[in-house]
Amino acid sequence: METSSMLSSLNDECKSDNYIEPHYKEWYRVAIDILIEHGLEAYQEFLVQERVSDFLAEEEINYILKNVQKVAQSTAHGTDDSCDDTLSSGTYWPVESDVEAPNLDLGWPYVMPGLLGGTHIDLLFHPPRAHLLTIKETIRKMIKEARKVIALVMDIFTDVDIFKEIVEASTRGVSVYILLDESNFNHFLNMTEKQGCSVQRLRNIRVRTVKGQDYLSKTGAKFHGKMEQKFLLVDCQKVMYGSYSYMWSFEKAHLSMVQIITGQLVESFDEEFRTLYARSCVPSSFAQEESARVKHGKALWENGTYQHSVSSLASVSSQRNLFGRQDKIHKLDSSYFKNRGIYTLNEHDKYNIRSHGYKPHFVPNFNGPNAIRQFQPNQINENWKRHSYAGEQPETVPYLLLNRALNRTNNPPGNWKKPSDSLSVASSSREGYVSHHNTPAQSFANRLAQRKTTNLADRNSNVRRSFNGTDNHIRFLQQRMPTLEHTTKSFLRNWRIESYLNDHSEATPDSNGSALGDRFEGYDNPENLKANALYTHSRLRSSLVFKPTLPEQKEVNSCTTGSSNSTIIGSQGSETPKEVPDTPTNVQHLTDKPLPESIPKLPLQSEAPKMHTLQVPENHSVALNQTTNGHTESNNYIYKTLGVNKQTENLKNQQTENLLKRRSFPLFDNSKANLDPGNSKHYVYSTLTRNRVRQPEKPKEDLLKSSKSMHNVTHNLEEDEEEVTKRNSPSGTTTKSVSIAALLDVNKEESNKELASKKEVKGSPSFLKKGSQKLRSLLSLTPDKKENLSKNKAPAFYRLCSSSDTLVSEGEENQKPKKSDTKVDSSPRRKHSSSSNSQGSIHKSKEDVTVSPSQEINAPPDENKRTPSPGPVESKFLERAGDASAPRFNTEQIQYRDSREINAVVTPERRPTSSPRPTSSELLRSHSTDRRVYSRFEPFCKIESSIQPTSNMPNTSINRPEIKSATMGNSYGRSSPLLNYNTGVYRSYQPNENKFRGFMQKFGNFIHKNK
């Protein structure tokens, strides 16, 4: 195959465009050899003989003659000084240097290739033309802006002003490397001495000298050139390169030009500087102090003085015995590796782009026969690096100046675990020597994310601060400050936890009657009512769409009373807490009594819902004594519930399960009663558990007739059962709270018992009659109700929710005398007033919430005498509480009571002295409302019966724990929205807020009188 030279000889026109004729001439080399060996005259004679012109300038001739170094005369040569013509003057280019390369011990920023962007160059001239700043001012500005490193390469440096800026930068912790021409170094040294500065003793400045190439003659004589490069590299991001030398004359006299370079081209200057630094040497004037600094070891890079520095290929290989036996090879600990010049990788560089996917083309074995060292990961990293600093792995060096023997003993390296700076090669020095074997591997993406979070203050810490250890502790703390990424994750995690804990949409009420969190915020915030109500309405819609898992309770229409049972016990018309005697076991009942056939036999331990509240202690005698002063002390209830009853806990777990099953009843806030802290330890959502609790004993007939009040009925009955209850309840706590309706329900006739058994049959005739019953009740809308409809405008969501509310027909109202204990007038009750009847039932439904235990305990005798004992005929109106026509989804649970209504009303306001004793028909009226049909217009009815005292109203809830108030964050009991503001039923947090309750009582009396 023909070569290019053969083709060129055949056809002279076939030459490459890049071909350049060689300019080398042999007589050039011979003339230089004669000049070195014989001087200037022999050199000129040779040019005449060869008939060539002079090619050297006089300055060059003088430089060669001045700097030539001749070899010593050898005995092998003859006495006539004749030279052997066979000797060659060719230059020797070794593959490896036999001199170790120095380390960048002050640190060097690592710039990932390709991240600097496009190259941008600005030209500056001296004297300045279009720029405001001169070249010298620009140099000073760049030095002031340096934050990491200043790398200066200069032929001659004698400018005092620039030198002062460099020294000041070193005091800020900026690493300063200065490379000067060896032939002009003496000028720099003289300048520093005149300024009174020993530059070799400055902790953050390294000054070294660089000389040009060596020219070797045929006889072995040689001379070297100068280092004429001039550039300033700042933070490996900006370069000033040009003809400007750091001398006074260049500022005032000489013309010069420089380039300000940024971008990708800076990487070339970065590599060039590290190449020059690798071939630099310590000046002879500094050699004595340098040798004293490293006298305790073989070399700086071998004895660990340049701590944590990744040794370059030349420096490590030059200090090893390639073919000798390695001593201490069995000691594979960190101290051995460190002392032998083997250091861990930079923690960032282990995951950088340079490390991944790079396979060295040549991996020499510098360990000889030592196979163990061959497989050390630190060793492998050092083998594939190129010579010195020209493109090898970034160097790792300490930021604390621990490279002095004195400071190294006082400041041993610590294990710094914080990830190093992303822009510093030497950043891993802050982490101490971390072994490769126990460092967990991390992804490069994680490392890159950590680099981005490094702030400027932390980046500045990549340079040494001081010799002492004061700033060591400060940096130790700074490096452990939480990063933005970790802080954000922690904040989001805490926010999710707090959001979950503060979400009370599914929460059950706690012991004080309010949802979790109501005690802490918004006591008097009416906005919470609307917000929570709207939320409940959305829950209502979901309950309409999704069928409840728990079957609805069967409904049966009472043929005798014309009403039907409701599945929502929480909205019973006349359900009100009864008064509680002073004995701790006043309302206890037997737990071993047989259950009715229609009642499923479920354990009582699983009845109560689980709440975010403390449990009632086993003995409540102390709590009862605190409320015997005649007024309510509701704040004490929180501190009374400290004990935990296992039975109560099991009871709550079952109730929570029932609550979750029945999605149409998120919370049943209105279905709580019997607030006495000593007598009622559980409360039950009667919608789910009314058929599961055991019925109380039937009260004696003579007791019902002779008793003057409902309170006496229950009180006497409880006294009869006190001994049996104590025997069955060894803890002495209340396990059941008996309501008047429950007591009278046992006294029903046989016909009513059969009627109660029909409630479990869904296909009963009474179940089918319910629709027609509602229609008749709707048609019986009286003018009074229509009149009140326009007066009382309830919110939209109240009207939406009360779609199933029904009215009571006129004929039914004739059979239901109305109960109004607080009315002052003695006029006969209006038997046909459907509005008063409807509103009275609404109020009594609202009063299903609790009464202060203190006022029940301290009920006066005249209050007990206020209500005559009901006759046996009343029992037919007191069927199991609840109306079937009531909304099955408990829509008026939206009524979120205001927090100020939580505390109970004081007892003196609860007993009006001027009210006459109502007749037996009035009492029947209160119980007949349990059997009435609910109306959607009830929210607009008069509130004439809203002022009746709750102490006389029966309580149909069973197994309910003490609840301090009726105001919960989410009130899911069925009641009228107008009665939401009836503070006479609920405790308020502030005692003076009972004035509002008194006002409502007076307002109700006024309305009733007008009728």
Curated annotation (Swiss-Prot):
Composition bias, Low complexity: 557-574, 913-923
Modification sites for Phosphothreonine: 782
Gene Ontology terms: biological process: cell population proliferation; positive regulation of epidermal growth factor receptor signaling pathway; signal transduction
Effect of residue 230 to A: Loss of interaction with EGFR. Loss of activation of EGFR
Ranges of Basic and acidic residues composition bias in the record: 694-705, 750-762, 813-828
Single GO cellular component term: membrane
Record keywords: Cytoplasm, Membrane, Phosphoprotein, Proto-oncogene
InterPro entries from the UniProt entry: FAM83, SACK1
Family the entry assigns: Belongs to the FAM83 family.
Free-text note regarding domains: All members of the FAM83 family of proteins share a conserved N-terminal DUF1669 (domain of unknown function 1669) domain of about 300 amino acids. This domain mediates the interaction with casein kinase 1 (CK1) isoforms. Therefore, it has been proposed to rename DUF1669 the polypeptide anchor of CK1 domain.
Subunit structure: Interacts with EGFR; positively regulates EGFR inducing its autophosphorylation in absence of stimulation by EGF. Interacts with RAF1; displaces 14-3-3 proteins from RAF1 and activates RAF1 within the RAS/MAPK signaling cascade. Interacts with AKT1, PIK3CA and PIK3R1; activates the PI3K/AKT signaling cascade. Directly interacts (via DUF1669) with casein kinase isoforms CSNK1A1, CSNK1A1L, CSNK1D and CSNK1E.
Name of protein: Protein FAM83B
